[in-house]
């Protein structure tokens, strides 16, 4: 399908038609339409910086993980684009049942509102991860492997981080011991896969840990954990007020760390049907005041209770086959 043939409006209206239908209702899309979304959005990602500089007001959302019905609930709550500006922090695919609808609506909105709708890369927007955790299988079942590869080409061009009004630093995972200057992020060339170590890996994989000073080993077997001291030093050095990241299930949909200098957002309520967590969305107004909108979990009791940010971290098992042993 030639670029001009992609009818984004038609696709968006079809994707929104399932509002109010039974959760999980499949949206009919052609392979040509989905491929067109990937190609056009990839062009837009490459035309915009890898480190986005954004202005408030906007709403920031964490992991969605294919929970399409919950994504629609978020938009119902916060306003469907272009009613509000949005920044999503990655992890659109895998685990949930409707990764295709989820990523297609997000890419369609990116194409329709390129200056008001922004998507960062999460660790699941990476072929070696989404090959395993569900997206590949969903693409293969509903379309074909070639289309999954087209998504990979698109994901390899997503921006990595954003700064809101020079004060709020946003990324999917967290900080990196290699990050001294924002220029280092700007120098990352796209398209790129996510390496196993280094700056890009850390921005997508690292986690805060209240029991760590400085840098620690990460139970995921990838990247590091970092303490409150690292957060404070980073904010001071770059004259920032807040780090906003996702990547971990948190019970209330949002959770502060390091005396409110960092916030974790997670926007998939009842994650995987196994957690009793709420989903959170952060609204940043023109004065940079942050407030939180919460999607409550459904009433049914989850299989497991979840005790907070540092209890377990089930979000993604180790990336390597043999993670480094804890010393």
UniProtKB/Swiss-Prot annotation:
Region described as Disordered: spans on this chain: 305-327
EC number: 3.1.3.16
UniProt binding sites for Mn(2+) 1: 63, 65, 91
Reaction(s) catalysed (UniProt annotation): O-phospho-L-seryl-[protein] + H2O = L-seryl-[protein] + phosphate; O-phospho-L-threonyl-[protein] + H2O = L-threonyl-[protein] + phosphate
GO MF term set: metal ion binding; myosin-light-chain-phosphatase activity; protein serine/threonine phosphatase activity
PROSITE patterns: SER_THR_PHOSPHATASE
Gene Ontology BP term (one): cell division
Keyword tRNA-binding appears in the UniProt entry: no
Manner of cofactor binding, per the entry note: Binds 2 manganese ions per subunit.
SS bonds (residue pairs): none
Residues reported in the UniProt entry to bind Mn(2+) 2: 91, 123, 172, 247
Domain of life: Eukaryota
Alphabetic keyword roster: Acetylation, Carbohydrate metabolism, Cell cycle, Cell division, Cytoplasm, Glycogen metabolism, Hydrolase, Manganese, Metal-binding, Nucleus, Protein phosphatase
Positions bearing N-acetylalanine: 2
GO CC terms, sorted: cytoplasm; nucleus; PTW/PP1 phosphatase complex
Function summary: Protein phosphatase that associates with over 200 regulatory proteins to form highly specific holoenzymes which dephosphorylate hundreds of biological targets. Protein phosphatase (PP1) is essential for cell division, it participates in the regulation of glycogen metabolism, muscle contractility and protein synthesis. Involved in regulation of ionic conductances and long-term synaptic plasticity.
Family affiliation: Belongs to the PPP phosphatase family. PP-1 subfamily.
Designated name of the protein: Serine/threonine-protein phosphatase PP1-beta catalytic subunit
Upper lineage: Eukaryota, Metazoa, Chordata, Craniata, Vertebrata
Gene designation: ppp1cb
